[in-house]
Amino acid sequence: MVVVVAAAMAAASLCCGVAAYLYYVLWLAPERLRAHLRRQGIGGPTPSFPYGNLADMRSHAAAAAGGKATGEGRQEGDIVHDYRQAVFPFYENWRKQYGPVFTYSVGNMVFLHVSRPDIVRELSLCVSLDLGKSSYMKATHQPLFGEGILKSNGNAWAHQRKLIAPEFFPDKVKGMVDLMVDSAQVLVSSWEDRIDRSGGNALDLMIDDDIRAYSADVISRTCFGSSYVKGKQIFDMIRELQKTVSTKKQNLLAEMTGLSFLFPKASGRAAWRLNGRVRALILDLVGENGEEDGGNLLSAMLRSARGGGGGGGEVAAAAEDFVVDNCKNIYFAGYESTAVTAAWCLMLLALHPEWQDRVRDEVQAACCGGGGRSPDFPALQKMKNLTMVIQETLRLYPAGAVVSRQALRELSLGGVRVPRGVNIYVPVSTLHLDAELWGGGAGAAEFDPARFADARPPLHAYLPFGAGARTCLGQTFAMAELKVLLSLVLCRFEVALSPEYVHSPAHKLIVEAEHGVRLVLKKVRSKCDWAGFD
């Protein structure tokens, strides 16, 4: 009897302890953060236990999906570039209700949503390592990014950036342009061959996969010393891993309380299986290049990983993790986002043939002035209209729709005291489409590259490559890659929207065309007979 009573008391004590822990984690701790912000006059929707404002977010999303908040259309007149209400309806509705600074919660995670330029300015100027990436998002995206540069914090992040950044300095990028041209010529020639085989002068096709192949080939050649053929499996699996991570169903309560290991989901297991296969393929690539100094990013990472000395099994495993995680990060950042931006750019040029003609004339003048040579780095720098088109594309369709940070200690931004643990969300699309910030002849939601002709963009309201110390280190590389592709495509083709194109931006870690970008390509005779074409 005594044993039974003792067991019952122990069970009751355990239940009380678990209940107290859950109450603290799910309500008390986040409520303290919310109270800290409320005392500063920062409002927001009222959260409920235990999921915060998640039910409201789902309700707003369902209403937007049912009403098609921005037009999904097949005709040019139906295309609306302001996708905020369709993709992020909860943010837009709350911003209109509570102003440019408000707070909301997802489970026990407290978010400070900021679209006030003065606060964004201070965030951009903050170089403290105590402003990092969200611990929750880091855990959620672990199979895709691991401990690589995109999600790491503190000294680990600083070390990785110091190692990787020099590989994307302008002097390095100059030497990569010829490889980019080679990859672009393969793509353009394949499109010409398909048109010739069709027996006509034009072709209606979905361009997304072909552009991803180009972007993947560029990354493989320039950063890892291999061809796309060799790395195709890695790219395909990373794409599949991205889809799995962005759509996998979370057991939110388990994630919030640190008990997710007790409630594994099938989608989570699938992500980790894919991660294992990606890891094995990358290590095979490392093995092939392990004894070589190719002067590329992979070689630099291998040198850094081996710099720790001999060590035991744990050291070797850590070195492998370092190389694998950063390879995945570079593959994703340099491959997916650039390919999506190129697709959006061609879609916008198809909608605006006057800009297409301007860019084509400019490219031919820049390259044919050098005797018809293929574009090199100096020629790319002369392409001002093309630069403006890319800048405007990145304004309307930034790959990263949100800049997210977590306060790893209490910070002050724009007069707002941000307590430790609060996640700061800056909606890039909101800043990029703000009518007050982007005034002038064309509306903020209209395509007008000329807005970049003479004036600098509004300070701290144009964030296509992120903000602050964590600004994308590969932006010079990405701009060169985009210019090479677009210049070669436009010198060989006129592009128009296909009647089958359906405009529907969607957020899948980055903002991309949900149904792909479908164009009609018509061959034109270029004034520049670049090697590899004729």
Swiss-Prot record:
User: What follows loss of this gene?
Assistant: No visible phenotype and no change in the levels of 13-OH GAs; due to the redundancy with CYP714B2. Cyp714b1 and cyp714b2 double mutants have decreased levels of 13-OH GAs, increased levels of 13-H GAs, including GA4, and longer uppermost internode.
Cofactor(s) needed, names only, are: heme
Question: GO annotations under biological process?
Answer: lipid metabolic process
Enzyme class, spelled out: oxidoreductase
Enzyme Commission code: 1.14.-.-
Q: Where in the cell is it found?
A: Membrane
Q: Which Gene3D superfamilies match?
A: Cytochrome P450
Any one of the GO CC terms: membrane
**Any one Pfam family match given in the protein's UniProt record, by short name:** p450
Q: Which UniProt keywords apply?
A: Heme, Iron, Membrane, Metal-binding, Monooxygenase, Oxidoreductase, Signal-anchor, Transmembrane, Transmembrane helix
Could you tell me the membrane topology recorded for this protein? Single-pass type III membrane protein
Its family?
Answer: Belongs to the cytochrome P450 family.
Further facts: Overexpression of CYP714B1 in a heterologous system causes semi-dwarfism and increased 13-OH GAs content.
Name the job this protein performs: Catalyzes the 13-hydroxylation of gibberellins (GAs). Determines the ratio of GA4 and GA1. Converts GA12 into GA53.
Q: PANTHER family per the record?
A: CYTOCHROME P450 714A1-RELATED, CYTOCHROME P450 FAMILY MEMBER
Indicate what this protein is called per its UniProt record: Cytochrome P450 714B1
